[in-house]
Amino acid sequence: MTKLLDEAFGEGEMPFDIEPADIDETPLEFETPLAHVQRLAQGKAHVVAQRYTDLDVIVIAADTTVDVDGEIYGKPENLDDARRMLGEMSGRTHRVHTAISVVRGDRQAHTVDSASVTMVQISPELMDWYLGIGESLDKAGAYALQGDGGKLVETVQGSFTTVVGLPLEPLSDLLAQCGLSWKFGA
């Protein structure tokens, strides 16, 4: 994510820090994937913004979840869970939702961007190889499109940056709503 942020914010043109926001990410009973990801992004932004009430700081929080037939796939608990997730998505299309919350003083702006991802039919050999490289455990849905997990993906309909966790065009709109004009890649 740091590499994406460096590219997005011009390799130092806009300095940033990454701060953890320790919130409970357990889905609530009957919570939809969209509601879940929105709640987490807004909760993370609120927690971090509370640390800077006296400063003119822009807080950007994002959270990504994989939606497989309405079931929330967050980060896998272990390799068996990653194998289960990838096996269930193999040869199928799922949705990836990334929610972004921006807070600047008393201004707040929030959105969710979604993309559809179709996975290849994952052979046992491909599954074993991918799980063996160690990339799956810290990614929603157990794969990283921007890494070797891209080999598991057949097509993406929507924004690549949504799937990797920070949709840049919607983020630019949210920053403008909070008083900062910033165009990514400009």
Please identify what each model-predicted range represents.
Residues 1-19, 177, 181:
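N-terminal G-site helix/loop of the GST-like fold
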Residues 11-30, 108-114:
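Short glycine-rich, Thr/Ser-proximal phosphate-binding strand/loop in the N-terminal lobe
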Residues 31-186:
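Anionic-ligand binding patches
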